[in-house]
Amino acid sequence: MVREVHVSGTVRSLCLIVAALVGCGFASPFSAESRFIPAPAKKTEIRWRDSTALGTPGDGRLVRGVRLPSAGRSFFTWDPVLRRAPNRGWRRWGTDDLVRVVLRVARDFAEAHPEAPRLGIGDLGLERGGYFGPKHATHQNGLDADVYYPRLNRRERPPRTAAQVDLRLAQEIVDRFLALGATVIYVGPNTPLTGPPAIVQPLWNHDNHLHVRIAPGP
């Protein structure tokens, strides 16, 4: 038995409008073609300026610092206190040279390993440098940054233990910072990461991240 269906004038009008839009080349927002189109990536804005590192990493200040963005195509930031991404903006300041080095390593690493997680960046320093807090003896003049080791399971968050670290990729990150002139790289004593002994040094509480320091600019 065929049941007669009555369509109201409002519904009929909506159907005609949809049909007209499709005929003009407008795809339905629920079509297969539009469902999987990724949103365009936001442009990473950085206010570049010539920075000056004063004093030492353990007793210094930062003049005209540059803030690392909260995230980009090749990196994410992590707040070690709140234990979430992104890191708060006031914790992401460094010299322009430091920010450039971090972004360069992140970009080159992502290009070499598109299957790997983005590089995780932790604390840099304060906008004007100075004492950062009880968990940081240095990070005072814009030359230090914490960088998390990639995890074996590819999750974009810091590893909990050295056993979760992808040591092959972590060593490559160490090597990339060395190639760009890092003067100090602290690594976890339970991670067999290597480099020139005067630069790559084991230090407690660094089993989930490395601490990189660059030289001050001229």
Describe the predicted segments one by one.
Residues 47-54, 101-136, 184-201:
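Extended, low-complexity, intrinsically disordered C-terminal regulatory tails
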Residues 74-91, 144-162:
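Short, conserved helix/loop micro-motifs enriched in His/Cys and acidic residues
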Residues 113-114, 137-142, 178-179, 203-206:
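Extracellular/periplasmic catalytic domains that process cell-envelope and extracellular macromolecules
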Residues 2-65:
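N-terminal secretory targeting signals
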